[in-house]
């Protein structure tokens, strides 16, 4: 039986590659990301390439805590069980040495790379623990 894999930051790069790898293994994927156009493009592409797997898409900005809760709830209502969570969303801003980083860039990276992913984990974890995942 195919597993259901939720992937944050799935619209490009590593997230897209992870989604493709799970689909190649016969798993179903839930693609999340900020770029709605990319989510729809990937859904169409993956549906054509992997017709036996299911691909769901949900727009998600992990820095928006209300959106995280809403989307998590929507995903759990749509999909019977989440087997795997790949918290891939992240970003890197600026190329300056650390001491020269802009404070806003650091805060944005913390909001995305730490707080956002913690919020996503916290949202899905109870259902995954209940299902022994």
What are these regions (language model features)?
Residues 3, 81-82, 129-133:
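Active-site loop of short-chain dehydrogenase/reductase
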Residues 11-13:
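Conserved glycine-rich cofactor-binding loop
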Residues 25-41:
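Conserved glycine-rich Rossmann-like NAD(P)H-binding loop of the short-chain dehydrogenase/reductase
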Residues 60-70, 103:
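The beta1-alpha1 cofactor-binding region of Rossmann-like NAD(H)/NADP(H)-dependent oxidoreductases
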Residues 89-94:
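Conserved NAD(P)H cofactor-binding loop of Rossmann-fold oxidoreductase domains
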Residues 96-98, 102-110:
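Substrate-binding pocket helix/loop in short-chain dehydrogenase/reductase
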Residues 121-122:
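A short, exposed helix-loop element centered on a Lys and neighboring polar residues
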């Amino acid at each position: 039986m195919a597993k259901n894999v939720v992937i944050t930051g799935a619209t490009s790069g590593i997230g897209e590659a992870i989604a493709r790898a799970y689909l190649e293994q016969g798993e179903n994927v839930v693609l999340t990301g900020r770029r709605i156009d990319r989510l729809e493009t990937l859904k169409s592409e993956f549906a054509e390439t992997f017709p036996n797997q299911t691909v769901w898409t949900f727009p998600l900005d992990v820095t928006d805590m209300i959106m995280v809760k809403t989307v998590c709830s929507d995903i759990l209502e749509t999909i019977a069980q989440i087997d795997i969570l790949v918290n891939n969303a992240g970003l890197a801003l600026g190329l300056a040495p650390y001491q020269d980083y802009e404070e806003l860039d650091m805060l944005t990276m913390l909001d995305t790379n730490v707080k956002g992913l913690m919020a996503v984990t916290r949202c899905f974890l109870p259902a995954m623990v209940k299902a022994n995942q």
